[in-house]
């Protein structure tokens, strides 16, 4: 998907809270919005180069969103709104092999007390619920989720098991918001409960998928499947 708004580079200064950061643009310090509540400590390092998206909304306190950052030569998208958009584009273009037969794609649909990112249906009425998780944590080609404890994420995984137990299809797709990685694994040290829930989900037949992305400063798209170790 293309990012149609104005894109520019800046120098990262600091992040005083989850939603705000300070950057240097043309020698001027400016506060920007961070559209990611994760820690992103390995990306948002003082002095590093980050990518901003200009919003031009007079009702906002900040003019820019901080949407990506360079980790060395590697560009990593950190915008938490991006994964669902990328996966939706991939589903519409039948790029996810095991989901190609699901032609009816609905977003943000409820099952029981749960809300999942996608509800997919085949022509014969077969239903599949898909949850998407964005991944930004990487170390030497190994990617992990989460980068902060996530009770909500664990809840989603357990709810997918419930979907599967009721005879429907269920899956979680980890969208790795960078390119050229080797493997994905749950971050057991950060959130043991999430890792255990994911292992149980696999045992119960929930599909566990991971894809990396082709990331450029003004575009991002689904790339290739990534091996998973749970």
Curated annotation (Swiss-Prot):
InterPro entries: SfsA (IPR005224), SfsA_C (IPR040452), SfsA_N (IPR041465). This is Sugar fermentation stimulation protein homolog. One of its GO terms (molecular function) is DNA binding. Coiled coil: none annotated. Pfam families: SfsA, SfsA_N. Belongs to the SfsA family.
């Amino acid at each position: 998907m293309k990012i149609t708004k104005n894109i520019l580079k800046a120098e990262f200064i600091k992040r005083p809270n989850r939603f705000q950061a300070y950057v240097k643009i043309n020698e001027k310090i400016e506060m920007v919005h961070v559209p990611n509540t994760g820690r992103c400590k390995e990306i948002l390092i003082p002095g590093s180069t980050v990518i901003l998206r200009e919003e031009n909304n007079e009702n906002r306190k900040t003019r820019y969103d901080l949407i990506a950052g360079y980790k060395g030569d590697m560009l990593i998208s950190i915008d938490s709104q991006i994964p669902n958009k990328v996966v939706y584009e991939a589903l519409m273009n039948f790029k996810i092999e095991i989901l190609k037969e699901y032609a009816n794609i609905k977003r943000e649909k409820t099952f029981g007390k749960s809300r999942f990112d996608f509800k997919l249906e085949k022509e014969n009425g077969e239903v599949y619920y898909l949850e998407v998780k964005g991944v930004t944590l990487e170390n030497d080609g190994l990617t992990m989720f989460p980068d902060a404890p996530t009770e909500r994420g664990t809840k989603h995984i357990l709810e997918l098991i419930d979907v599967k137990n009721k005879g429907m299809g269920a899956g979680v797709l980890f969208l790795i918001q960078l390119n050229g990685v080797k493997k994905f694994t749950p971050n057991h040290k950060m959130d043991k409960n999430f890792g255990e829930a994911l292992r149980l989900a696999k045992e119960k037949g929930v599909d566990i998928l991971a894809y990396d992305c082709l990331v450029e400063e003004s575009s991002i798209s689904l790339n290739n499947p990534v091996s998973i170790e749970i």
